[in-house]
């Protein structure tokens, strides 16, 4: 019996994960990637012995990756080595205060008590609240698509009881009094483009997720995980075609029929998925269809969350005081975020996120760097 054919456009984390699932489910799957390496936005550069990852820097749920490899009876550890990051993050402020966010309760309690003894009990209540959110919003509903706030409430009335309509920062304030601690427990939304003063408190579940699963880094860099997924996909019989950009998703009578490549060749598929940018997908890949044009117009009118301005640099000496993840908060936390999200203005006293992977994996740079 002929296997159904599936195409995946884009070889980022989502595209490769889907391709592995399709191939494991019995599809004859092809991944089309326009660049010379897999990874999409999780691209990588190597220069003068340094490894520069363009992709995400934090892995918080290795169990999801384990499940993906287990679909075909494989083990994640046979393909990539995940290293535990400790502390998870070092947070610092302009007044000289630092806070190491670790997975050691006694060390956390000591740091919190040094700031405000009353917040030790408050933090424990916050952790219990985060655990409730984790069970409801991640374990029960992590696979459920929420297309709007109403659909979330219909699917999960318990989230209303947990006050998911309030912001992360507002809920954190219910538990701790110290401003530094409030920032330490609410900054996570910034890593996904959301303001802690406006993003639903359901995102406070990230704290429980990290305390449960840890924070990890792949030996060799984030792209080592991309390489692992691409290797697994090809071992399962999938086809990865690099430097092969897709031009359009072909359709007939309202149904997808295949992929037209940049060179003009059309290949037929039973199903096609796009892991490319969503606006690009509707405007370019499906721009010849009424649905594509209408969705592109709608999306262009939406308000998008901000991205990051990233500078990659290599240092000539080691800096042992640096931690893997260091976040330096500016002097105006609420005001600065308000300017970015409310006025689209980047002030001079912005906050910094410093990613120093050599603190965990010395192989990311030449010896002595």
Language-model segments: residues:
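A short, glycine/Asx- and small/polar-enriched loop/turn
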Residues: 95, 195-199, 250-257, 367-369
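Helical element adjacent to the flavin cofactor pocket in flavoenzyme catalytic cores
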Residues: 205-260
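Rossmann-like flavin
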Residues: 92-199
């Amino acid at each position: 019996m002929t296997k159904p054919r599936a195409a995946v456009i884009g070889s980022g984390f989502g595209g490769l994960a889907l391709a592995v699932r399709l191939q494991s489910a019995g599809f004859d799957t092809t991944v089309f990637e326009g660049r010379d390496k897999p990874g999409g936005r999780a691209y990588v550069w190597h220069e003068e012995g340094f490894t520069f990852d363009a992709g995400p820097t934090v892995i918080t749920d290795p169990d999801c990756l384990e499940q993906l490899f287990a679909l075909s009876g494989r083990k994640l550890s046979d393909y990539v080595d995940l290293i535990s990051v400790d502390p998870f993050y070092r947070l610092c402020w302009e007044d000289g205060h630092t806070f190491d966010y670790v997975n050691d309760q006694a060390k956390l309690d000591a740091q919190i008590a040094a700031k405000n003894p009353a917040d030790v009990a408050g933090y424990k209540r916050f952790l219990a609240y985060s655990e409730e959110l984790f069970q409801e919003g991640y374990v029960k509903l992590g696979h459920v698509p929420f297309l709007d706030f109403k659909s979330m409430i219909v699917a999960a009335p318990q989230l209303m009881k947990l006050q998911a309509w309030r912001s992360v920062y507002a809920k954190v304030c219910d538990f701790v009094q110290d401003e530094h601690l409030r920032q330490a427990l609410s900054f996570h939304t910034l890593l996904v483009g959301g303001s802690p003063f406006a993003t639903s408190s359901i995102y406070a579940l990230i704290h429980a997720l990290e305390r449960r699963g840890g924070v990890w880094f792949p030996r060799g860099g984030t792209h080592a995980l991309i390489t692992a997924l691409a290797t697994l996909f090809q071992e399962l019989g999938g086809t990865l075609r690099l430097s092969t950009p897709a031009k359009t998703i072909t359709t007939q009578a309202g149904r997808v029929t295949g992929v037209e490549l940049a060179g003009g060749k059309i290949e037929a598929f039973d199903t096609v998925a796009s892991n490319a940018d969503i606006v690009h997908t509707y405007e370019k890949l499906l721009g010849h269809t009424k649905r594509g044009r209408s969705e592109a117009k709608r999306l262009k009118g939406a308000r998008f969350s901000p991205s990051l301005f990233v500078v990659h640099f290599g240092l000539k000496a080691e800096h042992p005081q640096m931690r893997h993840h260091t976040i330096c908060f500016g002097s105006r936390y609420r005001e600065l975020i308000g300017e970015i999200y409310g006025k689209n203005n980047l002030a001079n006293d912005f906050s910094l996120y410093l990613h120093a992977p050599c603190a965990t994996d010395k192989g990311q740079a030449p010896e002595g760097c």
